[in-house]
Amino acid sequence: MTPRPRETSDAEILAAAARVMQRVSPVDLTLADVAEEAGVHPATIIQRFGTKRELLLANCKAWTADVAGQFAEARAKYRSPLKTLIEHSVECTGFASTPESMANSLAYLQIDLTDPEFHAVLLAQYMTMRAETKKLLDHAVAARELKPCDTAALARLVQQVNAGAMLDWAVYRKGPLAAWTRRSVEALLAPYRSGRYRKSRWA
């Protein structure tokens, strides 16, 4: 008996949508584009998500729900709180590694800022990111990787520098975005580094 083909999961479809969103603006994106990327029939997208708006909203919600998990994975991978923060900041630039994908990202951001339902999800995402960043900074201070400081204020600055660095890079276009972001975050954190820096045992 021929085995039944494995059904494409919602998560796989949303991952396909995210890839298409890097290449195509919200005006030009179609459910057929996403279906082709996911290897499913367009009717499957309609059955699962309905309209293009609902698909984009589901993608936004899925990304937001995964923020804390992404930080946890980075902590397990890098151990050091300070290294975790820097490397995670760099890894988060992968969705917009070209000026064109950055432009598309900004186009989707307009929806996030003008549609109340999207904005509520975006705000939750940013609040979680800031809370997780503060947690890493608190651990970095405890591990003596950073000097004692106002970690809430510094977390806000880290978030702002991350966002600003990506837009700045899209204008100047010098080198890869990952390297540009790394330099920006490290420059922000440099004055806070402890003179007694040691390899952290924090986990």
For each feature predicted by the language model, list its residue ranges.
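Helix-loop "lid/cap" segments that line or gate small-molecule binding pockets
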Residues: 74, 90-96, 104-114, 187-191
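Generic hydrophobic, amphipathic alpha-helix propensity
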Residues: 9-18, 34, 59-63, 67, ...
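Hydrophobic alpha-helical connector segments
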Residues: 58, 69-102, 154-158, 182, ...
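Amphipathic alpha-helical packing segments from all-alpha helical-bundle domains
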Residues: 68, 98-106, 116-142, 153-156, ...
